[in-house]
Amino acid sequence: TATTEIYTLSPHDALPIWGDEYEGGKLAVERIEKALEDGVNLTQETTLSGGYPKRLAKRAKEAGYYIRLYYVGLNTLSESLHRIQNRVAKGGHDIPHHDVERRFSRRFDDIAKLLPYCDEAKFFDNDNGFVLVAEYRNGELLPVGDKRPAWLLELINAIK
């Protein structure tokens, strides 16, 4: 029989264990590093901020991993903040406004740095459900369907 080992941990899931998202984040990175070392397939949810996602993608690519990126986009900072407020109201974790603003303003630069390591990427608009609006293959970003949200047009300009 075939078996699959899956490493899974969110910094937010670690709160009951560690009582601290920072410690949970460190544990998540340790597990990601272990999966990479062991050649285990993995997935990571990330804001793409900081240098770690790019460094991880580069190392994974060098180790022979096939890299897929799934990006969910929103048009405005206020949409992002509103979603965080809704999550907090339902008992989820909060993110400081200044962190959201900083990450939001750099999001396309972060994607542009990561795309060279991706074998494929799919971009979804999340204005009203998930709608596939573009795909990245063979080094090219290709619109899909008729929907062209403002953020997608910004992304296209950012990666030219």
Language-model features, listed with the residues they occupy:
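Anionic group-transfer/hydrolysis microenvironments
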Residues: 1, 47, 127
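Short, small-residue-biased leader/transition segments that mark boundaries at the very start
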Residues: 2-15
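Conserved nucleotide-binding/hydrolysis micro-motifs of P-loop NTPases
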Residues: 14, 49, 73-79, 128-130
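Conserved nucleotide-sensing/catalytic segment adjacent to the nucleotide-binding pocket
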Residues: 16-65, 98
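Small/polar loops that bind or transfer phosphate-bearing groups
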Residues: 44-45, 69-73, 124
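Short, glycine/charged-enriched secondary-structure capping and boundary segments
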Residues: 57-60, 83-86, 136-138
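A glycine- and Lys/Arg-enriched "phosphate-lid" helix/loop adjacent to the NTP-binding pocket
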Residues: 65-113
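NTP-dependent small-molecule kinase module
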Residues: 114-160
